Amino acid sequence: QTKQQQEGNTLWLKEGEPSVETMLELFAQYDLNVINELVFCGFGEPLERLEDVCRGIDSLKETYPNLKVRLNTIGLANLIHGRDVTPELKGRFDTVSISLNAPDEKEFLELTRSKFGIQSYEAIKEFAVLSKQYVPNVVMTVVEKVMPEEKIQKCQEICDTLGVTLRVRPFEN
């Protein structure tokens, strides 16, 4: 499908945060056997609602046991919840994709304005490392054309050190 075709066939939230029941009702309108991957993402952090996301995935996997699920995250869930939540990802997510966004903590904080301050950058890297224990695929991402090549190379070095894949996402208007 083209991006234009997808716009009319989307689960983008238009009005507030749905309950788990509403989310499952929306998913029930689709045959999830024909999709490659279900992605939890958004403007914000999907794991703000960790329990709801887990309940929803558990329910969906009862019907679709082979459903592939990806989490797109900023990687701050452990700071949000004040504990290590990565064990709860096991068996639920096949991929965790963390927005690295920057080659250093200062630039990351300038870009994200995280309420957790300068510790956020180390926290996302730790989240990546911890996630590897529970999730088969852990990647960190940056956006091409937004970042010069030398900064992308620095991000690659960070990912190499962490033992995760760097994915350079295409810039989309």
List each language-model region with its residue ranges:
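Canonical Radical SAM [4Fe-4S] cluster-binding loop centered on the CxxxCxxC motif
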Residues: 1-18
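Glycine/small-residue-rich loop that forms an oxyanion/phosphate-binding "nest" at active or ligand-binding sites
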Residues: 19-21, 25-35, 39-41
